[in-house]
Every structure is written in structure tokens, then in C-alpha cells.
């Protein structure tokens, strides 16, 4: 993948690669490097080929999906399951880059679960985007009409759709 993360430093002169992309993955990679260094100092024998294979195949090994994952081209459709203010702030930075660099309109299909910092997340989203508010098919999902009301308080504009499929198709 062109957008995957590669890191070189003195501890890993041949570099590390992960198939995950997104600005926040740099921070995650450095956390992994710190953990590996700590475990090595504690005499854990973690083989280089094991952590390299784990990082390179993290999606296949864990089933992780939706971390700044490009699922379609022309138009570009990017999926990200960011669910807290920190994650959304990283997403906002990346969306700003796309918006400014390519002068593209940004359309966001958006749903939330009801046990997160909904107001904080909504405040962290870009105001210039067009939103398609929806309810995911999970028990904890916030109804789309409630989400729209909170989004409008945060200065966001959009329309509600009862399902994710309908929101994407709109």
C-alpha cells in the first residue's frame, strides 16, 4: 500500500512496516517501539521476524478494519472507526489536508454509540463537511435524529438516514 507506514531509526536500521495508515499510526508505532525496547531490557526474547510479521500483517492477524482504510477509489471512500476526541482530531487533520490540497468537498457518513463523548467528538469534526448522520446496527448506537440534534449544536450540517447503507448511497 502506498499509504502504509514505514519507520527507520537507529534501533531498527532496516525499518519497520505496517499495513495500517493514518496520521495516528506514527504515534502507535512509536508506542510499539517503546514497548519492544522495554521488553528487551526485561530480557524478553522477542524475535525480530515475529514483530515485523505482526506489524506487516496486523489487519489479517487481528481482523482490524477501518483505520483510515481506503475502501473505494473514484470517488475516494475512506473508512475510519475513530471513536474518541483524540482519534477524531487526527482524522480532522487528514481531512483538512485532503480538503485544502485537492480542493475536494468532504462528505462524511457518521454514526456514534451512546456511551462515548458524543459532544466532544462532534466539536472535533470539521464544520465544512457535509454530513450523513446514521445509526449503526449495534445496540449501543445513538439514533440518527438524536445525533443530528447534537451535531447541529456543534455547528455541523447534514441529513439523517436510518441505515448506514442508505447514508452511503445518498
Residue ranges of predicted features:
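Nucleotide phosphate-binding/pyrophosphate-handling subdomain across enzymes
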Residues: 12-130
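C-terminal helical cap/extension that packs against the catalytic core
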Residues: 1-6, 76-78, 119-170
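Short acidic, glycine-rich loop/turn motifs
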Residues: 6-12
Amino acid at each position: 500500500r502506498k499509504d502504509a507506514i514505514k519507520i527507520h531509526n537507529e534501533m531498527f536500521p532496516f525499518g519497520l512496516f505496517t499495513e495500517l495508515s493514518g496520521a495516528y499510526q506514527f504515534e502507535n508505532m512509536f508506542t510499539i517501539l517503546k514497548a519492544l525496547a522495554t521488553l528487551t531490557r526485561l530480557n524478553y526474547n522477542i524475535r525480530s521476524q515475529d514483530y515485523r510479521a505482526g506489524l506487516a500483517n496486523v489487519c489479517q492477524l487481528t481482523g482490524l478494519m477501518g483505520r483510515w482504510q481506503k475502501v473505494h477509489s473514484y470517488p475516494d471512500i475512506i473508512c475510519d472507526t475513530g471513536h474518541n476526541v483524540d482519534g477524531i482530531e487526527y482524522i480532522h487533520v487528514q481531512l483538512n489536508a485532503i480538503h485544502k490540497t485537492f480542493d475536494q468537498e468532504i462528505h462524511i457518513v457518521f454514526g456514534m454509540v451512546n456511551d462515548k463523548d458524543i459532544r466532544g467528538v462532534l466539536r472535533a469534526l470539521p464544520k465544512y463537511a457535509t454530513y450523513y448522520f446514521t445509526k449503526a446496527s449495534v445496540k449501543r448506537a445513538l439514533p440518527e435524529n438524536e445525533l443530528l440534534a447534537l451535531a447541529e449544536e456543534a455547528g455541523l450540517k447534514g441529513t439523517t438516514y436510518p441505515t448506514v447503507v442508505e447514508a452511503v448511497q445518498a
